[in-house]
Amino acid sequence: MTFPAGAYVLRKVFIPHGCPLIFRLLLAVICLSVPSFACPKSCHCSERNSLTVVQCSSRNLEEIPPDLPHDTVSLQLSSNHITKIPNQAFKNLPWLQELDLSRNAIETVDAGAFKGVSESLRTLDLSHNHMQGVPKEAFARLHAKISLSNNPWHCECTLQEVLRELRLDPETVNEVSCHTSDQEKYAGKPVIQVLDSGINFCNFHHKTTDVAMFVTMFGWFTMVIAYVIYYVRHNQEDARRHLEYLKSLPSSSQISKDFDTISTVL
């Protein structure tokens, strides 16, 4: 069964035969007056086992539709122009099992992007996007089979920690490659192949951090030493000038002789 875009669809409600007539009438009025969802205007909706499949592929969408059917079980958003998955983008979709966001222009995935669907989601396709990295929290407690292939990944510690926890699609796992890397020699290689060889990007990260701290501390130490040297030399110069000034003053014996000469003349 399919529904036109923008149509309201009512849920099937089970009413026990033993219920009073007034209760059954009241429940019927509520169901008629409060629609369970509306199919987005840019999408096409159909029914699957009393739940809703929302087809929004190739609709020139630039963002995820905000008012999706509450009972959506499958959401197809491939081949659009979506650039970001914001926090709680699917929070009102507790039945969501299939999510296809492939072939978009996604660059950013917020930390709470999949909050609310982490338990229900079974498949997640993020292939063929523009993602270079994702926060660790974005896929927390996510049990879905995930496709991340054909993205320009930057291989570093955070990505390594993310991939270690994910259930990657085995058919596309070798297409998850390092586009760039903290270690240039790994660029262009499959991430899993690099990690399975024993490479630990987190070690590189810590070493880089240690080197940066050492350089910073060395710079401060050099500045302190330079200041001490300047201070000592400046004081020495002041002392030298003061000594020369004292030497330029007439001595007490010379003053005494000059005084005697003046007295004799007088």
From Swiss-Prot:
Its main location: membrane. The chain crosses the membrane at residues 211-231. The keyword tRNA processing does not apply. Residues 1-38 form the signal peptide. GO terms for cellular component: extracellular matrix; extracellular space; membrane. It comes from the Eukaryota. Keywords: Leucine-rich repeat, Membrane, Repeat, Signal, Transmembrane, Transmembrane helix. Gene3D superfamilies: Ribonuclease Inhibitor. It is found in: Membrane. InterPro entries: Leu-rich_rpt, Leu-rich_rpt_typical-subtyp, LRR_dom_sf, LRR_TM_domain-containing, LRRNT. It is a single-pass membrane protein. Residues 39-70 form the LRRNT domain. Residues 151-204 form the LRRCT domain. Coiled coil: none annotated. SMART domains: LRR_TYP, LRRNT. LRR repeats lie at residues 71-92, 95-116, 120-141. Belongs to the LRRC3 family. This is Leucine-rich repeat-containing protein 3. It comes from Danio rerio.
